[in-house]
Amino acid sequence: MLSSLAPYMANPRQTLTQVLNFALVLSTAFMLWKGLSVVTNSTSPIVVVLSGSMEPAFQRGDLLFLWNRSPRVDVGEIVVYNVRGKDIPIVHRVMRSFPELPGREDKKSVKKGGEEGEETSSTPSQKLLTKGDNNMADDTELYAQGQEYLDRKEDIVGSVRGYVPGVGYVTILLSEHPWLRSVLLGFMGLMVVLQRE
């Protein structure tokens, strides 16, 4: 086994260069993702549709591009939101909007320095009710327990501004079959290391 590594050990400078090139590719991809997050003001500027709840507008596996710089969301707009306590993005259409009155205080339970208390905020936040185009009822059953609507500032990841059909199936396959992710990453690493200049 060690004899197969001999060509790489004979020229450690070239091997180190290849490993650093692979690390550079990974760090560049990470920086591009973070840069896109800053530009779009979204924690996930690109998401994949995971279910058929938005058919016929979007199919399972479609890749969506999000934008979260608008201060308000209009009724009929398609948004991506996260349910509190869960890390699964949901793509649905806004059915109703409930604007907060300016000056009304929102009370939020916060924990600072180990002590629990209430924090009040007088900035208005838009409240939204969503529904999948292919669903019979609105999303109140999907929201966190006791939550009747989505908060624009806290729950919305972004509004859909564009999409590419079917490209996200790769992501779905990688999440449904974790071993495939390891094989793909190992193959990419092997290709970089074995590449000769």
Curated annotation (Swiss-Prot):
The keyword Oxidoreductase does not apply. It comes from the Eukaryota. Residues 34-197 are lumenal. It is a single-pass type II membrane protein. It catalyses: Cleavage of hydrophobic, N-terminal signal or leader sequences from secreted and periplasmic proteins. GO terms for cellular component: signal peptidase complex. Residues 102-134 are annotated as: Disordered. The keyword Signal does not apply. Keywords: Endoplasmic reticulum, Glycoprotein, Hydrolase, Membrane, Protease, Signal-anchor, Transmembrane, Transmembrane helix. Residues 102-115 have a biased composition (Basic and acidic residues). The active site is at 53 (charge relay system), 92 (charge relay system), 139 (charge relay system). It is found in: Endoplasmic reticulum membrane. InterPro entries: LexA/Signal_pep-like_sf, Pept_S26A_signal_pept_1_Ser-AS, Peptidase_S26, Peptidase_S26B. The chain crosses the membrane at residues 15-33. SUPFAM superfamilies: LexA/Signal peptidase. GO terms for biological process: signal peptide processing. Catalytic component of the signal peptidase complex (SPC) which catalyzes the cleavage of N-terminal signal sequences from nascent proteins as they are translocated into the lumen of the endoplasmic reticulum. Specifically cleaves N-terminal signal peptides that contain a hydrophobic alpha-helix (h-region) shorter than 18-20 amino acids. Component of the signal peptidase complex (SPC) composed of a catalytic subunit SEC11 and three accessory subunits SPC1, SPC2 and SPC3. The complex induces a local thinning of the ER membrane which is used to measure the length of the signal peptide (SP) h-region of protein substrates. This ensures the selectivity of the complex towards h-regions shorter than 18-20 amino acids. SPC associates with the translocon complex. The C-terminal short (CTS) helix is essential for catalytic activity. It may be accommodated as a transmembrane helix in the thinned membrane environment of the complex, similarly to the signal peptide in the complex substrates. This is Signal peptidase complex catalytic subunit SEC11. It comes from Paracoccidioides lutzii (strain ATCC MYA-826 / Pb01) (Paracoccidioides brasiliensis). The gene is SEC11.
